[in-house]
Amino acid sequence: MTPTVHTWPILETARTQVLEQGIGLTEDQLVEVLQLPDEALPQALELAHQVRLRHCGEDVEVEGIVSIKTGGCPEDCHFCSQSGLFDSPVRGVWLDIPELVKAAKETAATGATEFCIVAAVRGPDIKLMNQVKFAIGRINEEVDINIACSLGMLTQQQVDQLAGWGVHRYNHNLETARSFFPQVVTTHTYEERLETCAMVKAAGMELCCGALLGMGESLHQRAELAAQLAALEPHEVPLNFLNPRPGTPLENQGLMDGKDALRAIAAFRLAMPRTVLRYAGGRELTLGDLGTREGLLGGINAVIVGNYLTTLGRPATADLSLLVDLNMPIRELQKTL
């Protein structure tokens, strides 16, 4: 006798609405996904994977990141060891142009198509903008790779400059839900982040705008964030999981439960069926090797390889080998410069 397979109404709804019609789940529907019991998780991940394959394709985008300026940031993002306001071991460091070119070459050698230049700042000053301009020029001369930037909040003039220099994609994360944001950042507002995101999109750059999960937000706030990101329609959403850093206000926050993280991955994919959903920081601790594999079979279709800004990531070879094992091709470079 064939055992009966239990089905959950929200997953049946998602199959019709998201998989077949390509319409993302609403905030209330996402809460239902995030509240699914553990026994429903395999079905949720399988459905999210089917959505990814149908609406995004089978290939996986690989990216590397490097920090041009580390530490000394004047903002008080409670999760970040680069804030100059906290007693963190991270100290201010600048990379010179040859080091950036070297990092871009190493990133390209992994098969990555995207290289992101990141700075720990509220927003870039003239010195930083000049450094970025020269770095972009040198990298374009020597490396065949798309260049992205993450330099904090921008003015319209800075947005226009970056677009003019050929920046392919700009990262500016919402991090968390609007309702939870004041509990983790007080030195700038949610609206200021949204303003930069809107200018980036209007200038024709691809917007990368993501989440940092596991900071103490509720399931409803995770759903709120996913819905807010879906409304923003970014090209890419990186999913970070809190890795509590010494000296920060969140240093004693426990790690997010791995199954909750996988539920979130499925939910974000069901909210945004056509968006690039990228594994970013913290997955090594929150999910480990097995969880990383499950996420790639549960909606993820992009990865950051190598190390992050102030923490160690999985070796690039481990992620690339996993993609081979899963028979997932790496997305080929399509230069936009």
From Swiss-Prot:
Species name: Pseudarthrobacter chlorophenolicus (strain ATCC 700700 / DSM 12829 / CIP 107037 / JCM 12360 / KCTC 9906 / NCIMB 13794 / A6) (Arthrobacter chlorophenolicus)
Disulfide bonds: none
SMART domains documented for this protein: BATS, Elp3
PROSITE patterns listed in its UniProt record: RADICAL_SAM
Cofactor binding, note field: Binds 1 [4Fe-4S] cluster. The cluster is coordinated with 3 cysteines and an exchangeable S-adenosyl-L-methionine. Binds 1 [2Fe-2S] cluster. The cluster is coordinated with 3 cysteines and 1 arginine.
Function statement: Catalyzes the conversion of dethiobiotin (DTB) to biotin by the insertion of a sulfur atom into dethiobiotin via a radical-based mechanism.
Pfam families for the chain: BATS (PF06968), Radical_SAM (PF04055)
Keywords: 2Fe-2S, 4Fe-4S, Biotin biosynthesis, Iron, Iron-sulfur, Metal-binding, S-adenosyl-L-methionine, Transferase
Transmembrane segments: none
Record keyword Metal-binding present: yes
Reaction catalysis annotation: (4R,5S)-dethiobiotin + (sulfur carrier)-SH + 2 reduced [2Fe-2S]-[ferredoxin] + 2 S-adenosyl-L-methionine = (sulfur carrier)-H + biotin + 2 5'-deoxyadenosine + 2 L-methionine + 2 oxidized [2Fe-2S]-[ferredoxin]
Cofactor annotation: [4Fe-4S] cluster; [2Fe-2S] cluster
Pathway(s) where this gene product acts: Cofactor biosynthesis; biotin biosynthesis; biotin from 7,8-diaminononanoate: step 2/2
Residues annotated for [2Fe-2S] cluster binding in this entry: 116, 149, 208, 278
GO biological process entries: biotin biosynthetic process
Subunit field text: Homodimer.
Protein name in the entry: Biotin synthase
Domain of life: Bacteria
Encoding gene per record: bioB
Family under the similarity heading: Belongs to the radical SAM superfamily. Biotin synthase family.
Recorded GO MF terms: 2 iron, 2 sulfur cluster binding; 4 iron, 4 sulfur cluster binding; biotin synthase activity; iron ion binding
Domain Radical SAM core residues, every copy: 58-283
Residues involved in [4Fe-4S] cluster binding: 73, 77, 80
Its EC number(s): 2.8.1.6
